[in-house]
Amino acid sequence: MLNNTSSDFDLIIRQQPNRARVAGGKEKEERPVPVAPSTALAGTLVSSLHRLKDVDNSDGGFFVFGDLSVKIEGEFRLKFTLFEMRKDRVSYLKTVISERFTVSPPKSFPGMMESTHLSRSFADQGVKLRIRKEPRTMLKRSTRPDEFHQPVPTRSPERQSVQIPPSSSYGGYPPAARDYGYYGQQPPVKRHRTSIDYGRQQGLYDVDGRMARQMDPYGQPTAAMYAGQPAAYQTPAAMQTYNTGQVVPDYTAMYPGMQASAGMQASAPMSQIPDPTGQSRSSQQQQAAVGQLMAMNQPGTPTPDSTGAMMAQGYARSGYPPSSTILPPLQRSRDYPQGTNGSARAYFDQTPQANTPILPSQMVNEGDRFSSVTGPTTFNHPDSPNGTPQ
């Protein structure tokens, strides 16, 4: 057994106590080492040897007191004593005393200091220590009067709200760099529709025929609806007189001889519309032609035209007065021989097939429509062998 004396050991306080605050509250009943209760000190009063690395990376043995407090206010010095503990006895080795430090009450305590580099190094090596990254004095220091939070001014003098005078033109957009006021200061300016706007809207609809049709689908006729369009879409005079109240005359029952007596060109194509300037007939001649048409075209009278053969024989004509404008025939007329009285007449064989009305949706061949004749138009009348009307 070796006899160790105080000359074999050297105790150095690496970190001196600087200041402390009076500790309060009850002490812990369970202690790692049972010692006699102290009237002045609180916390862990005993520490074991820790083999740690110093800040210069050298090995050393350190006694760390991380939970040591003073319960009395005043100025004190700490005394550390080194003991060697054996199985059956404890040997005193050496003692060291710290520098003087002040224990202050909580009201006058300036605050905890920042953890030193040595404490951080021990904490990194596994020692349980409370590390403070910044001093507590910076967190709990008194606030100066000039550091109080100043309220934000409602409006700086340099930036005032620009009041825009009311204008009736509304010509352009507002400038993007202007300063707007707060929402609660004045109500938003709304644009009210004036009589000028209504006039512009109605003028737009008058010019554009499509707008007029959408606004009033049951209004004026088509000719009045498109009255404001450019002259590039002019309609012939014969087509402009149509409206919803007029009745289209029946052109399917017209005789070619009547068309010749009225002075109309029977050889015009079906899709061709005559020029209104070329019509030299007067209104009296047109009315006379229409009257002759209605007198000769009685219900049940057979018609020589193929379109008339498709209509029912008992089709009742409308009693409304016909239009003053007569359109060209729908199909090309045939050259029928004229009689001695100057009027053209034609006859065809009234067979049961010819008397049967044929609707446009039914299929019909050329033989049923023209009495099985593919050559020039001839009619087999009972009175003449060659088809010449008597």
UniProtKB/Swiss-Prot annotation:
Component of the velB-VosA heterodimeric complex that plays a dual role in activating genes associated with spore maturation and repressing certain development-associated genes. The complex binds DNA through the DNA-binding domain of vosA that recognizes an 11-nucleotide consensus sequence 5'-CTGGCCGCGGC-3' consisting of two motifs in the promoters of key developmental regulatory genes. One of its GO terms (biological process) is sporulation resulting in formation of a cellular spore. PROSITE patterns: VELVET (PS51821). Gene3D superfamilies: Velvet domain. Residues 3-132 form the Velvet domain. Residues 137-149 have a biased composition (Basic and acidic residues). It comes from Penicillium rubens (strain ATCC 28089 / DSM 1075 / NRRL 1951 / Wisconsin 54-1255) (Penicillium chrysogenum). Belongs to the velvet family. VosA subfamily. Keywords: Nucleus, Sporulation, Transcription, Transcription regulation. Residues 165-175 have a biased composition (Low complexity). The N-terminal velvet domain contains a NF-kappa-B-like fold and is involved in DNA-binding. The keyword Transcription applies. Residues 137-191, 265-390 are annotated as: Disordered. Residues 350-364, 371-390 have a biased composition (Polar residues). This is Spore development regulator vosA. The lineage of its organism: Eukaryota, Fungi, Dikarya, Ascomycota, Pezizomycotina. Forms a heterodimeric complex with velB; the formation of the velB-vosA complex is light-dependent. Interacts with velA, velB and velC. It holds the Pfam family Velvet. It comes from the Eukaryota. It is found in: Nucleus. The keyword Transcription regulation applies. GO terms for cellular component: nucleus. Disruption phenotype: Results in a severe conidiation defect with reduced sporulation. A motif (Nuclear localization signal) lies at residues 273-280.
